[in-house]
């Protein structure tokens, strides 16, 4: 699976931080944060397949777990980074969590910012459904005045 990264560093001895963007974005989304991270990390901003500089192969699996495995494989085989911290937002947050699940020996920590995909069911209701109708009726009064 084609994954691409942009490396930013002041010191290659700093621990690796892999940044995973959300759907429809690219690794460049992290550029404004990179300068603050360079003092402590070598930063790898990932381009997911079909985003940024990474091509899309239509026959590849694109689910979060497959993408997570592809990023770990890419970092270990092509970049020669065995241990990494990972952070991601939205879909990238979900992929980051999956990276820790598929490669716990490689992922040192995860920061998932507003990760997608966590609600497979709606949370339990705290208020009775009948209250919805009363609230909507009250709100609609302000729009129905003539």
Which role does the model predict for each range below?
Residues 7-55:
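Conserved HGGG/HGGXW glycine-rich cap/lid loop of the alpha/beta-hydrolase fold
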Residues 16, 42, 82-85, 106-109:
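Structural signature of beta-strand start/N-cap positions in the alpha/beta core
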Residues 88, 92, 96:
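Gly/Ala-rich beta-loop-alpha elbow adjacent to hydrolase catalytic centers
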């Amino acid at each position: 699976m084609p994954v691409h990264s942009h490396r930013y560093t002041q010191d290659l001895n700093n621990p690796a931080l892999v940044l995973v963007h959300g759907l429809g974005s690219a690794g460049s989304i992290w550029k404004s944060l990179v300068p603050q991270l360079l003092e402590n990390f070598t930063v790898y901003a990932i381009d997911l397949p079909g985003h940024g500089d990474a091509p899309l192969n239509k026959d590849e699996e694109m689910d979060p777990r497959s993408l997570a495995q592809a990023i770990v494989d890419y970092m270990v085989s092509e970049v020669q980074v065995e241990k990494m911290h990972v952070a991601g937002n939205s879909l990238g947050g979900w992929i980051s969590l999956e990276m820790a699940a598929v490669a716990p020996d490689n992922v040192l920590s995860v920061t998932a910012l507003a990760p997608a995909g966590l609600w497979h069911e709606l949370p339990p209701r705290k208020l009775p459904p009948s209250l919805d109708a009363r609230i909507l009726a009250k709100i609609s009064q302000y729009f129905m005045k003539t």
